[in-house]
Amino acid sequence: MIVISDSGPLIALAKIDALPVLFGLYSEVLIPPSVLEETVGAGLRLGVADAQAVEAFHAAGKLQVVAVRSSRIELPEEIDLGERDGILLALQEHADWLLVDDLRARNLAEEVFSDQGAKTRIRGTLGVLVEAFRTGVLSQAETLDRLRALEAHPEIWLHKNLIEWAIRAVARHTE
């Protein structure tokens, strides 16, 4: 399975100590160089702990950096470089999944994938956690704890209503 990630899900999962969950679902994740810079380079310069967590998974070979080859596809600059590169890398590598949280980037990715006939599906941080619960990587209690941890981090740009929806969805299931 080929999985490409943007910065957002990596940073969010690192902030709640859930990067191991990502690699419980996928053996490796591909990222463009711009995402490594956004998550590790910029993060280390700012001294944020989540950058060290992402760097540790990169050093362990779980996060593979793959260059985006030149593309005929022009993407608007309304989304950031990591998101644009993630979309292009997903097309280039015929990815099964693109992990991205930003709504504009998700909408653009859906449009581009449809136009290009790509079968790449899109999932964000919440989708990763719910899938981890669904597949048994996380227990219900662990999933709920991680979802609630997202609420405690206002710097993670996930809408509170979406987090609450995910909490309700997981809480409704019995183990």
Task: Please provide the spans of the model-predicted regions.
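Feature 3881 marks metal-assisted phosphotransfer/nuclease machinery
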Residues: 1-2, 13-14, 18-28, 37, ...
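A positional/architectural concept
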Residues: 2-69, 76
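Ordered, amphipathic secondary-structure segments that act as subunit-interaction surfaces
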Residues: 61-101
